[in-house]
């Protein structure tokens, strides 16, 4: 029998969906199958090894009886695990007093991660730049994000591109 595994999108586990193509069956007999298989790990990659750990044959059609055949587990094949979509939002910028620069202080404590699997570790860090240095309300802040964490490579991340914050006038002190 030859094995064929399906590609999958990252789902946090190594379980694979595998099927067998039988050769050597008598006449037009067919057999049913239940295959247990797994990727070598849960992480994203191409050409990843998939190993079959158990095969259960069942009766098929045209007289194909499972009891007339034997098969052993242990076959391998390859398949791909592609990155899961992850969308980051909820990053904010702090309001500030005019200081003649466009630097923004970013707040990531309320960031949300749509698509992140429970137990996975992905953390955002962000820097921000106001559209100009002048005072204003609801000013656009462009966000530049970077990511870390043990599972970051398993995700295709859509960044939050901007937010808004205020720049207030600097109070002058009279002496």
List PLM regions with ranges.
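Short loop/turn motifs that initiate or flank beta-strands
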Residues: 1-173
């Amino acid at each position: 029998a030859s094995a064929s595994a399906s590609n999958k999108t990252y789902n946090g586990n190594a379980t694979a969906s595998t099927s067998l193509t039988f050769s050597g069956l008598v006449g037009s007999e067919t057999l049913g199958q239940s295959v247990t298989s797994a990727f070598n790990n849960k992480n994203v990659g191409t050409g990843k090894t998939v190993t079959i750990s158990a095969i259960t044959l069942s009766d098929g059609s045209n007289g194909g009886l499972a009891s007339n055949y034997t098969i052993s587990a242990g076959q391998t094949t390859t398949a791909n695990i592609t990155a899961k979509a992850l969308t980051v939002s909820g990053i904010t910028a702090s309001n500030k007093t005019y200081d003649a620069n466009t630097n923004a202080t970013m707040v990531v404590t309320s960031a949300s991660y749509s698509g992140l699997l429970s137990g996975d570790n992905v953390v955002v860090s962000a820097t921000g730049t106001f559209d100009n240095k002048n005072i204003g309300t609801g000013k656009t802040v462009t966000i530049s994000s970077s990511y870390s964490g043990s599972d970051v490579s398993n995700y295709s991340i859509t960044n939050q591109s901007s937010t808004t914050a205020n720049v207030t006038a600097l109070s002058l002190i009279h002496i």
